[in-house]
């Protein structure tokens, strides 16, 4: 993943469709997919998780079968997925789509993910599950 130091290293050109919930992002992306050789790449922090279909406006199974989207249903809900993970995965998908002659179309409304993709993130250590457990135990004991 690109960090702040190399944030201006260019990605292959791509189309970005973003906006608030229920603004027609998916419909716009599907319209492009009907007309052009595109690769749809989801930018949604909930749609990455399998089974979290309600409340996320995740395209239904028929739509996904007809118009596959990268980065949908790639994790189980108990598995962490960070903005850094997204940026790395999306960059790979954009590069792969471009190399195969398809137009990468990044579609979704998770602004932090888009920002991480465009500008990178400062280097930070990974979350420490043991430290998290200790903090949760302490909070439970002390309130």
Q: Which residue ranges define each predicted feature?
A:
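Phosphate/pyrophosphate-binding catalytic cores of soluble transferases and nucleic-acid-acting enzymes
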Residues: 1-143
């Amino acid at each position: 993943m690109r960090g702040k130091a190399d944030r201006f290293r260019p990605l292959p050109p791509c189309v970005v469709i973003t906006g608030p919930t229920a603004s027609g992002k998916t419909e716009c992306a599907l319209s492009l997919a009907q007309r052009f050789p595109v690769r749809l790449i989801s930018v949604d922090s909930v749609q990455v998780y399998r089974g979290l279909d309600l409340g996320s406006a995740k395209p239904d199974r028929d739509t996904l079968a007809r118009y596959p989207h990268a980065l949908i249903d790639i994790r189980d809900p108990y598995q962490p997925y960070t903005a850094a993970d997204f940026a790395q995965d999306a960059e790979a998908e954009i590069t792969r789509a471009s190399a195969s002659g398809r137009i990468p179309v990044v579609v979704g409304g998770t602004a932090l993910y888009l920002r991480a993709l465009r500008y990178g993130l400062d280097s930070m250590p990974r979350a420490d599950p043991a430290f998290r457990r200790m903090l949760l135990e302490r909070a439970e004991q002390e309130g």
